[in-house]
Amino acid sequence: AGTNLPSHCDMNKTIGIDMTAGSLGQGLSCAVGMALAGKIDKKDYKVFCILGDGESQEGQVWEALMYAGNMRLDNLVIFIDNNKMQIDGMTDDINSIEPLDEKAKAFNLHTQRINGHDVEAIEQALQNAFDTKDKTSLIVLDTIKGYGVDWVSSKGAGCHSMSITEAQWREFCGKEDV
């Protein structure tokens, strides 16, 4: 029962997820380890890590970013979903991580900041990451939580862990039988 897109990515439910992590930032440290192993073993693969801005307040994330920059892991692409919200409220009100792109550049990361709702911008940022040699890539995705669904995005931080009813789902999909 439930969704294959739970609030925390689950490798047992979501295709393409190789490791389950959570809100404490361990996922990036593991991604750095996977990318480093690929370099040591001379394997030709990319490692992708998706973080939220709330979990990016964790010290472990900053240690992993610094290490990735120092190791020049050009086979690692990190996305940070910068929707400016976390479970307890607005990220800036709790513990601001801005200016995120400037901090990442100081760690020797190839850093891009884009509209996270623009698919073409994401594709271009990925191509730029693939073309970058000797630097880990970090892509900051500026997003709006609930983008495109007014009755969700208007809730602000209150939509962080909200559930929707079956009736809301049907209304959103515009179908009686979903």
Where are these regions (language model features)?
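Cofactor-binding active-site loop characterized by glycine-rich and histidine/acidic residues
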Residues: A1-N70
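A short alpha/beta connector and helix-capping loop motif
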Residues: E58-N83, L138-L141
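Generic beta-sheet signal
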Residues: Y45-C49, L76, K135-T143
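Conserved thiamine diphosphate
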Residues: K42-Y45, D92-A125, K175
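Histidine/lysine/aspartate-rich catalytic loop segments that bind and position anionic ligands
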Residues: M71-I94, E98-A104
